[in-house]
């Protein structure tokens, strides 16, 4: 049987740079990698099924968008392969309604929200003008289980009619009706941050919600602006979800409260800034990959002891 340290399945063309960096950094440490794409998924699935091929770790950036990768995911879940972001934990973590309640229980600040059931379960919900007045206007409408890139999210809603219309659009999904959170300004910058949890370590960056541009957050800035709580909040979310790798968005508002506004994104957009103006700073991408490398080395070492 051929055994590789890490297999990565992906279908999005813009993942290529991220995957290339992973291969380069891991192979420099004599860690073997295996890439799975649409052209070889059937062959790989067959070889894994027949136990001719095996992986110690698996990153799946494909089966959520391409059913051809689902069988391999099922097989590897039954083997000793360590799945980066266990599927069961992902399903729990991407449910915004569940995360909203669990974050509150963990002491995290979240936007005031109203959770409403799927249209397929309850056609009519009782929402009043008074409910909207508490939310404020505009407010945000979010499907609870539709994830990635703001899909299905309405950020400038004003009326009950918009809520009712959106419920029909995704009739099997719960919805969060959420107050809009506004960041304070820190020396001319919006205090909006995207934070990664990357294999045991938090990484925080500036992220402008209007321009979608990243900037590295320096240690001096973190100290001067009192932003170390970003790392603590991200660590708390990691404990709640049990995921290995995800991103979240946290806002510092004008009451000096850190508010988690976009709960968990398990499929992080890892386009690099040197090639994409709205990409993740290259240094941060390298840091995340080095965290992955160290996680694999540490886990292999522990398994060899056991």
PLM regions and their residue ranges:
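Protein kinase-like catalytic core scaffold
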Residues: 139, 176, 203-204, 246, ...
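Extreme N-terminal starter segment of soluble prokaryotic enzymes
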Residues: 2-9
């Amino acid at each position: 049987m051929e055994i590789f340290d890490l297999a990565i399945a992906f279908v999005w063309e813009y993942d290529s740079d991220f995957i290339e960096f992973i291969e380069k950094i891991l192979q420099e440490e004599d860690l073997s990698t295996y890439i799975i794409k649409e052209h070889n998924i059937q062959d790989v699935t067959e070889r894994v099924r027949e136990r001719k091929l095996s992986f110690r770790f698996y990153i799946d950036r494909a089966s959520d968008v391409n059913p051809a990768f689902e069988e391999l995911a099922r097989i590897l879940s039954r083997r000793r392969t360590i799945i980066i972001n266990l599927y069961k934990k992902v399903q729990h973590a991407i449910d915004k309604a569940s995360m909203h309640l669990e974050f509150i229980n963990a002491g995290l600040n979240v936007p005031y929200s109203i959770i409403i059931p799927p249209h397929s379960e309850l056609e009519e919900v009782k929402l009043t003008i008074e409910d909207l007045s508490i939310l404020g206007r505009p407010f945000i409408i979010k499907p609870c289980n539709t994830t990635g890139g703001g899909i299905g999210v309405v950020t400038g809603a004003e009326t009950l009619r918009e809520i009712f219309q959106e419920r029909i659009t995704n009739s099997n999904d719960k919805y969060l009706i959420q107050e809009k959170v506004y960041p304070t300004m820190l020396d001319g910058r919006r205090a909006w941050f995207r934070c990664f949890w990357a294999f045991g370590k938090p990484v925080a960056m500036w992220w402008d919600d209007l321009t979608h541009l990243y900037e590295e957050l320096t240690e001096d800035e973190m100290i001067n602006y009192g932003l170390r709580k970003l790392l603590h909040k991200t660590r708390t979310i990691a404990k709640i979800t049990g995921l290995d790798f995800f991103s979240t968005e946290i806002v510092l508002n004008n009451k000096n409260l850190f508010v988690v506004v976009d709960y968990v994104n398990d499929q992080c957009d890892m386009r690099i800034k040197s090639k994409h103006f709205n990409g993740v700073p290259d240094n941060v991408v390298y840091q995340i990959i080095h965290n992955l490398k160290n996680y694999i080395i540490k886990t292999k070492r522990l398994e060899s002891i056991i």
